[in-house]
């Protein structure tokens, strides 16, 4: 029997979690679907764009991601302290980015005066929203529901897009976190969809490598949780993301080395003739 999410997610034990969502019947609803003879690769960009929006709204950082044709991997860091540090105005602004919200919140944002009863009601709502903005289930809900609506609208149909609940796995130490990130980043290679990390579309490793390639450019900021060797946060930044427990070069080398190991239970590996990424 599936366990309640509150029993699976305990940020006191660990703030890091591996989350997986699969399309219904594991159909290729984000790639080439052999049944319908249609290509839905463009939906991967939908998912990535939505993840970026959510990472700017929630107190949840993305450590790694891989968007595949029939499922999605995310390694997330839940920062409850950050959510508690937000002022009420910040919480309201963030929540109204996701939802239209009640009239009292919209009126407050517009600068209209509120009565004492309305102020009390809004204060209660703010604390509810604050908890949700640091909640893993609400993050995945805001991701999956939005993508399902867009896909159903495109297909002119109704019904489920994702299989039931998303799955989550607690990452209890640094070794588990880093190995899971590497596993997620190697998904296209292991599935035989890509030969190199640089060609692994819609993965965090490709994004980190692209960022590293333009490290001397002015436009080199990233929304991903930073590795320890990356540039420090700018003084203007109001929020400091926690740095992941591995250097940039060590992580690149780890993923590259792991991806070259041939596994009998996987279809793909990085070919031996491909030069190391470093």
Identify the meaning behind each predicted range.
Residues 1-278:
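Short catalytic/metal-binding and nucleic-acid-binding patches
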């Amino acid at each position: 029997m599936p366990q309640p999410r509150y029993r699976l997610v305990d940020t006191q034990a660990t703030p890091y979690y591996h989350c997986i969502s699969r399309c219904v019947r594991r159909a290729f609803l984000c790639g080439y679907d052999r049944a319908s003879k249609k290509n839905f690769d463009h939906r991967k960009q939908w998912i990535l764009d939505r993840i970026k929006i959510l990472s700017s709204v929630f107190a949840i950082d993305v450590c790694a991601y891989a968007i595949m044709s029939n499922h999605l991997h995310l390694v997330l860091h839940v920062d409850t302290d950050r959510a508690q540090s937000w002022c009420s105005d910040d919480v309201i602004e963030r929540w109204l980015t996701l939802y239209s919200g009640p009239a009292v919140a919209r009126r407050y944002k517009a600068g209209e005066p509120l009565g004492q009863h309305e102020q009390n009601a809004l204060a209660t709502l703010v604390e509810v929203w604050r908890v949700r903005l640091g909640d893993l289930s609400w993050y995945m809900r805001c991701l999956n529901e939005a993508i399902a609506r867009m896909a159903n609208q495109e297909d002119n149909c109704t019904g489920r897009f994702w299989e039931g609940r998303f799955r989550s796995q607690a990452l209890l130490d640094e070794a588990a976190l880093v190995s899971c990130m590497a596993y997620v980043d190697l998904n296209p290679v292991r599935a035989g969809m890509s030969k190199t990390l640089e060609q692994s579309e819609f993965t965090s490793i490709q994004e980190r490598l692209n960022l590293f390639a333009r490290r001397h450019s002015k436009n080199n900021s990233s929304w991903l949780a930073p590795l320890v060797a990356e540039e420090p946060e700018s003084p203007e930044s109001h929020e400091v993301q926690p740095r992941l427990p591995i250097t940039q070069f060590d992580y690149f080398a780890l993923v590259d080395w792991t991806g070259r190991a041939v596994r009998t239970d996987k279809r793909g590996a990085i070919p031996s003739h491909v030069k190391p990424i470093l």
